[in-house]
Amino acid sequence: PIAGSMVLAAILLKLGGYGIIRMMQILPTTKTDMFLPFIVLALWGAILANLTCLQQTDLKSLIAYSSVSHMGLVAAAIIIQTPWGLSGAMALMIAHGFTSSALFCLANTTYERTHTRILILTRGFHNILPMTSTWWLLANLMNIATPPSLNFTSELLIMSTLFNWCPTTIILLGLSMLITASYSLHMFLSTQMGSTLLNSQTEPMHSREHLLMTLHLIPLMMISMKPELVI
């Protein structure tokens, strides 16, 4: 069910990050060099999840693996235990909570009209539902972390934290962000561009679906304009 996917991606997955923050507070303060294996593992996990996204043909699976890859960055930032790292992790959890939930919602609107989640079979939506394409574009831009979104601010904080801790991590981070941009653009082009396989009887987007997307993306845009609310 789509409601379960949205709650799982937006809230339950982020509770794991919150749990890591709480656990780090009660652990004895040690040098972050002790946590090197865990940080490398988190970044490597993020890259592997991103690479898995590139192989996906199922729309919901792609969005789910995308959530996993972002949580790898969150875990790495939390483990370093610096104010910037914690701020970036908190901001990314909030920003990606909105973004991934919006993407799952859009995937469901696509599924209700095509009755398939295969990317190649859902193409051509911009011809018949242009407003849906606009929502897809905005959600994917947020997922890529384009400025001035909160996703961009949080990833910039995390990148600065990891680079100050160990400059070599910029290679893993850069690779991760490159792959994120690749699969997000692939997802958008696969679902929106090309000639449609649907007949002309496709029902239009309902007001409730527009309202759902507005309630996801407008708060995120407003927080992006005033990030000190969450950072």
UniProtKB/Swiss-Prot annotation:
Keyword ATP-binding included in the entry's annotation: no
GO cellular component: mitochondrial membrane
EC number of the protein: 7.1.1.2
Any one GO molecular-function label of the UniProt entry: NADH dehydrogenase (ubiquinone) activity
Predominant location category: mitochondrion
Enzyme class: translocase
Membrane topology: Multi-pass membrane protein
One BP annotation, GO: ATP synthesis coupled electron transport
Catalytic activity: a ubiquinone + NADH + 5 H(+)(in) = a ubiquinol + NAD(+) + 4 H(+)(out)
Compartment(s): Mitochondrion membrane
Keywords assigned: Electron transport, Membrane, Mitochondrion, NAD, Respiratory chain, Translocase, Transmembrane, Transmembrane helix, Transport, Ubiquinone
Record field: transmembrane: 1-21, 34-54, 63-85, 89-111, 128-148, 169-189, 211-231
UniProt family annotation: Belongs to the complex I subunit 4 family.
Function according to Swiss-Prot or TrEMBL: Core subunit of the mitochondrial membrane respiratory chain NADH dehydrogenase (Complex I) that is believed to belong to the minimal assembly required for catalysis. Complex I functions in the transfer of electrons from NADH to the respiratory chain. The immediate electron acceptor for the enzyme is believed to be ubiquinone.
Name used for this protein in its record: NADH-ubiquinone oxidoreductase chain 4
Source organism per UniProt: Porthidium ophryomegas (Slender hognose viper)
Lineage: Eukaryota, Metazoa, Chordata, Craniata, Vertebrata
Gene: MT-ND4
